[in-house]
A protein has these predicted regions:
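Thiol-based oxidoreductase modules, predominantly thioredoxin-like and allied folds used
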Residues: 40-53
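Non-catalytic, surface beta->alpha helical segment in thiol-disulfide oxidoreductase systems
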Residues: 70-97
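Structural micro-motif
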Residues: 59-69
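Secondary-structure boundary motif
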Residues: 33-40, 91-94
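Short polar/charged helix/loop
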Residues: 30, 52-56
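Glycine-/small-residue-rich active-site loops that bind phosphorylated ligands and cofactors
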Residues: 19-23, 49, 77
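Local sequence-structure signature of Cys/Sec-based thiol-disulfide redox active-site neighborhoods
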Residues: 3-37
Length: 97
């Protein structure tokens, strides 16, 4: 069995949501269910109806909610794949020594 020493990198996670969006709510619930496993992830939920949300939607060209932004890169818009999301977090978290 191989053993790796690594430090977990800090990851920025922004969910750009809109009021009444069921997929946004599903992502929030999913995130809450796995959040304890990812202490290195800084999660922020921003409403698209705020000035900050409007600026992010414009910057990342997000036309449907939720917009999932990971480390300042658009991961998905209008939906999300749980498995791909976790793979992305694992890839970004690992910093081999």
């Amino acid at each position: 069995m191989l053993c790796y020493n690594y430090t977990m990198k800090t990851i920025s996670l922004i969910e750009l949501s809109s009021p009444g969006c069921q997929i946004c709510k599903a992502f929030e619930e999913f995130w809450k269910s796995i959040e304890a496993d990812w202490p290195n992830v800084k999660y922020e939920n921003i409403s698209v109806i705020t000035p900050e949300g409007q600026a992010l939607a414009s910057k990342y060209m997000i036309f449907s909610s939720p917009g999932i932004i990971v480390n300042e890169e658009l991961f998905s818009s209008g939906g999300f794949d749980k498995e791909k999301f976790i793979v992305k977090l694992k890839e970004l978290s690992r910093e081999e020594n």
